[in-house]
Amino acid sequence: MFTLKKTLLLLFFLGTINLSLCEEERNAEEERRDGDDEMDVEVKKRFITGLISGLMKALGK
């Protein structure tokens, strides 16, 4: 009975560690995806401001 409890306890802890590692990996992937989205927004903002300034120069001439 005692060895069964030790085995079950060991399996529980190993499962918990495995689950926490999976959560960390998933969080890291989400952070990478979020970072890419922020970069896309910055590029779009730069493009729009460049486009507007180019139009203003063309209309001002």
From Swiss-Prot:
GO terms for biological process: defense response to fungus; defense response to Gram-negative bacterium; defense response to Gram-positive bacterium; hemolysis in another organism. Its main location: secreted. Pfam families: FSAP_sig_propep. The keyword Signal applies. Residues 23-44 form a propeptide. InterPro entries: Frog_antimicrobial_propeptide (IPR004275). Residues 1-22 form the signal peptide. Keywords: Amidation, Amphibian defense peptide, Antibiotic, Antimicrobial, Cleavage on pair of basic residues, Cytolysis, Fungicide, Hemolysis, Secreted, Signal. Expressed by the skin glands. It is found in: Secreted. The modification Lysine amide is found at K61. GO terms for cellular component: extracellular region. The keyword Secreted applies. Belongs to the frog skin active peptide (FSAP) family. Temporin subfamily. Antimicrobial peptide. Active against some Gram-positive and Gram-negative bacterial strains. Active against fungus C.glabrata 090902 but not against C.albicans ATCC 12231. Shows weak hemolytic activity against human erythrocytes. This is Temporin-SN4. It comes from Sylvirana spinulosa (Fine-spined frog). The lineage of its organism: Eukaryota, Metazoa, Chordata, Craniata, Vertebrata.
